[in-house]
């Protein structure tokens, strides 16, 4: 398989990296991350005008990319810049609506690409422990529509989204893949309560309570009780995005550390000349390349289906979780005490790498999932 980027992708990467380097400095990013909104609407609009959100979707959805490698190119650059704007949720929600949305819902994808709408993925629940099928929020029929009740946790930009993609159970038990439905819910709908709070790595998330939220019948995304497959497909693209973002962040942490080792002196020489530190940096470099390979493999597999797709995605998420923690720890230790300070950008990259591990399943979850998928493959079960 040829993993070389096309000219169009290289141009996209160059444009985005240049834009972030010139317009998204660490100082401006830090100010934005600590703002009441946790992101910049103006910067979000500028990213959209540059076509970055459009690169996440295919032409049928109003974009011009949508391949796993298009997504990886974008998110690797976003990881290098520690971008806090809501790209991940735009990707996941947009994928779900493009796949299963009705004619009234698909225009939301176009609005996100244009920058006129912000969407949030409201799926995780307290106690779900990363299990995608663990949904306790309930949707019951009422008249010609639906009524939703439940609680969603750690919803990215949940305070400021225009629309929430909410998973709710319409039948079956709490852990069943069958019986899960998806709904497009206006954030300002009656019965929706949002409690926002700040993340340790910058930006904001929210806990969203749904109490007797009445929805029209056309709020249902796809078919009743058949939302899990749409959910799994969309989250798969999110895993590719997180893997690529982590690689971008790791690259910058490595660059900061190498620069410090070249300039920090002890006993009259740069500490980078000490053999023990050289060996540690060599291990970091090898680890990052392993993470990059796993991310590339996930980007290549995400457009497929079945167990092999899911194994590649879980392998990538496990790898970037384990390696991201190692890169963060080694980079801080090689910097000494200064590596922990707020003023040094490195500490923010370290926090982001730790948080990436906990999004859409941590390394322990995905290692266990990878093993279970392998067992299923050996038993001849071809479904994920």
State what each model feature region is.
Residues 98-101, 140, 166-169, 184-186, ...:
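Short beta-strand-to-turn element immediately C-terminal to the catalytic PLP-Schiff-base lysine
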Residues 131-149:
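Cytochrome P450 C-terminal beta-domain/meander region
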Residues 83-103:
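N-terminal glycine-rich flavin-associated loop
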Residues 1-85, 100, 115-116, 141-146, ...:
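Alpha-helical interface subdomain recognition
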Residues 99-118:
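A generic, well-ordered mixed alpha/beta core segment in the N-terminal half of proteins
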Residues 115-124, 166:
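A short, Trp-centered hydrophobic/proline-enriched beta-strand micro-motif
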Residues 149-193:
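A short core secondary-structure module
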Residues 130, 134-137, 185-216, 223:
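Flexible, small-/acidic-enriched active-site or ligand-binding loops
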